[in-house]
Regions:
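Bacterial N-terminal signal peptides that target proteins for export
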Residues: 1-8
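Bacterial N-terminal signal peptides
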Residues: 8-20
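A Zn2+-metalloprotease active-site environment signal
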Residues: 21-337
Length: 337
């Protein structure tokens, strides 16, 4: 009895000591900015950003969360290795666009955004032949853009806005920080297992349910941070940041009308009025208007035309029989030979 009581005390001490540790990983740091001008504090989610990531002039020379420490247990080398493993699977199960003009054009947009970002890793950018309106960047800078996203964008700035958002996830090491968060949750569950009994089991069961949800889906704070960094990157690269909110509105319309196209990239990026309003307020507050922005280019129109041509060719191939069509001979025809 005394031994069990001693174990209980040790477990509780470990659990309470882990609470501040986990809270530093799971919650936004207290050093936050006041609400943005133009936001309605009663309706817009209060997700503030650290002062350090608000300095646009310091892009590329500021710490936005990739430093090793309590919130990130993954080195850049480990993140690159992780991303390479995932990218091998992606390319083994996907069909890449082979058109060099399209590939080179998308790569040029992406590399320009990367140069104007906080990324500490080089990027490899490829286009996947898919109708999905999707783009995703893996840890270590392995970036894939679906052809459906290019065709869905009305101009180059909209495409650049989505790409900048995904680049921001890598620049801020969100996957590494999310995985660290999952490991911290697992560590916090150890004392609960040691306690035993109904209370300990219930607590452990709750954590095992929560952990996968936080492991595979970015938190609201990380998504907000990617929006915030993304508009900075596209702005610094010369694009009109309003194009990102315009694309958000388009995706919101597709969601409400239940269009048949699969909007995979935004199933975990709900285009709520609050999110759109908050991004717009950040643009108005943080980014001084420029005399001119890059919005559209002839290269964008050429790339869309080439992809539409490839799409039509693929549709024609799927409709054309790849082998002779056979017809069953009718009995009445048997005696005609």
């Amino acid at each position: 009895m005394q031994l069990r009581f001693a174990v209980l005390l040790i477990s509780l001490a470990f659990a309470f000591s882990a609470v501040p540790l986990v809270s530093q990983v799971l919650h936004v740091t207290p050093d936050a900015d006041p609400p943005l001008a133009g936001t309605r504090s009663s309706t817009v989610p209060r997700i503030y950003h650290d002062r350090g990531i608000r300095d646009i002039d310091a892009i590329g020379n500021r710490n936005i969360g990739c430093g090793r420490g309590i919130g990130n247990w993954y080195s850049l080398e480990r993140q690159i290795a992780m991303g390479k493993e995932y990218s091998d699977h992606v390319e083994a199960t996907s069909k890449l666009v082979k058109d060099p003009e399209v590939s080179d054009y998308i790569n040029a947009i992406g590399q320009n955004l990367v140069r104007n970002s906080d990324s500490l890793v080089p990027f490899t950018i490829k286009v996947i032949e898919s109708d999905d309106i999707n783009a995703f960047a893996l840890p270590g800078g392995f970036f894939y853009v679906d052809s459906g996203l290019i065709l869905a964008a009305d101009n180059e700035a909209e495409l650049a806005g989505v790409m900048a958002h995904e680049i921001a996830h890598v620049a801020a090491c969100h996957v590494a920080r999310q995985n660290t968060r999952g490991k911290m949750m697992n560590m916090a569950s150890i004392p609960l297992m040691m306690i035993g009994g109904p209370i300990g089991y219930a607590g452990y069961e709750a954590l095992t349910i929560v952990t996968p949800l936080t492991y595979f889906k970015f938190s609201r704070h990380f998504e907000s941070e990617a929006d915030f960094l993304g508009i900075q990157y596209m702005y610094k690269a010369g694009y009109d940041p309003q194009a990102l909110t315009a694309f958000f509105e388009k995706i919101k319309s597709l969601e409400t009308t239940k269009e048949s196209k699969v909007v995979k990239a935004f199933r975990t990026h709900p285009q709520t009025p609050d999110r759109i309003e908050k991004t717009q307020a950040e643009i108005n507050t943080l980014l001084p208007p420029q005399l001119e922005y890059k919005v559209d280019t002839s290269e964008f129109e050429d790339a869309k035309a080439r992809l539409e041509s490839l799409e039509n060719q693929g549709r024609m191939r799927s409709q054309s029989p790849s082998r002779p069509t056979l017809r069953r001979r009718e009995p009445s025809e048997a005696g005609q030979n």
